[in-house]
Amino acid sequence: MSGKSPAQTRVVVGMSGGVDSSVTALLLKEQGYDVIGVFMKNWDDTDENGVCTATEDYKDVAAVADQIGVPYYSVNFEKEYWDRVFEYFLAEYRAGRTPNPDVMCNKEIKFKAFLDYAMELGADYVATGHYAQVRTDEDGTVHMLRGADNNKDQTYFLSQLTQEQLKKTMFPLGHLEKPEVRRIAEKAGLATAKKKDSTGICFIGEKNFKKFLGEYLPAQPGKMMTLDGVEMGNHAGLMYYTIGQRGGLGIGGQHGQLTSDPWFVVGKDLTTNTLYVGQGFHHEHLYSTSLDASDLSFTREMPETFDLHCTAKFRYRQEDTGVTIHVKADKVTVDFDEPVRAITPGQAVVFYDGEECLGGAMIDVAYKEQKVMQYQ
């Protein structure tokens, strides 16, 4: 933290119209900071009923900001979001991968475009309603730690943040659990106290995903096969399926198979537009022993090349897995202590040392005993 008093410290809060960012602004205001609220409009968003949800959310931001007595603004990042997040999102699906737009949205919008805008407003820091914590050493190095609420910890989605971004960031909810945040909002009578949490893609909301994706990418139906060549039917388009997916295959326990075990997606072949499926949650082709990832980013300074035993998550809310990482510039090979199920290219692999999030990378390919998985 700077040597300034709270009253001399300007904090620009990213306010979404939800309860978390509302309480973030409230707590900072109560702590005496010079708080400004900013609503980011990143998507031209109309829901299934024709209601522009961004307009409704902005009204909630205005109501809360008025209640707690802070100025507020709206800023339009639709172009930045389209260029830096949505184009990436579509390119990943075209390549048969399953992207994580929330990771990219934090990296490119909330902690880049928004951070730059906040600095123009004279900010010393930005703050968001993420469940994560920061700790600063005497030498100024910032460590990003998991949020106190294990169910809500969001360091997975913040794993691409750099040291420079973290030095300018505050996470006032990091030490709180979600029920306590709700209680604070209710006690203060905030307009958003009872508003339900948003789900769905970062800034795109709760649209019908298949229909939404189909508006931007033409679907290419193809064959659904087992790994030993038995045709099981047709798929609607490889982009609609992810490794380990069970629902939406429409094959049940059919085709004269010996068991009634459910079917899962075990691979995709873009060259032949084939979706591979296998029977059983523990199908051997769902398990990998290592992966390669790129776009590696650490939350603090690290050597150019090194090996480290630590833990990792391969998806949000997953238990940590012991791994050994082999780092070379912005690429990393990750060897697992135990085989891991349903490693998904396009998703983030995020590294931890105890409570500290060290950073992460985007998964390119998984292997089983050096044999490439998922992409035949």
Curated annotation (Swiss-Prot):
Q: Which UniProt keywords apply?
A: ATP-binding, Cytoplasm, Disulfide bond, Nucleotide-binding, RNA-binding, Transferase, tRNA processing, tRNA-binding
Q: Where are the transmembrane segments?
A: none
**Which domain of life does this protein belong to?**
Bacteria
Q: Does the keyword RNA-binding apply?
A: yes
EC nos: 2.8.1.13
- Active site feature: 105 (nucleophile), 202 (cysteine persulfide intermediate)
Q: Which SUPFAM superfamilies match?
A: Adenine nucleotide alpha hydrolases-like
User: Which GO terms fall under biological process for this protein?
Assistant: tRNA wobble position uridine thiolation
Please list the residues that bind ATP: 14-21, 40, 129
Q: Which cysteines are joined by disulfide bonds?
A: 105-202
Q: From the Swiss-Prot or TrEMBL record, what is one GO molecular function term?
A: tRNA-uridine 2-sulfurtransferase activity
- Which Pfam families did the record assign? tRNA_Me_trans, tRNA_Me_trans_C, tRNA_Me_trans_M
| Catalysis performed (reactions) | S-sulfanyl-L-cysteinyl-[protein] + uridine(34) in tRNA + AH2 + ATP = 2-thiouridine(34) in tRNA + L-cysteinyl-[protein] + A + AMP + diphosphate + H(+)
Q: Subcellular location, in the record's words?
A: Cytoplasm
Provide the residue span(s) of the region labelled Interaction with target base in tRNA.
100-102
Chain positions covered by the region annotation Interaction with tRNA: 152-154, 315-316
Q: GO cellular component terms?
A: cytoplasm
The feature of type site (Interaction with tRNA) is located at 130, 347
User: What HAMAP family is this protein classified in?
Assistant: tRNA_thiouridyl_MnmA
Tell me, in a sentence or two, what this protein's role is: Catalyzes the 2-thiolation of uridine at the wobble position (U34) of tRNA, leading to the formation of s(2)U34.
- Give the family from UniProt: Belongs to the MnmA/TRMU family.
Any idea what this protein is called?
Answer: tRNA-specific 2-thiouridylase MnmA
Q: Which organism is it from?
A: Lactococcus lactis subsp. cremoris (strain SK11)
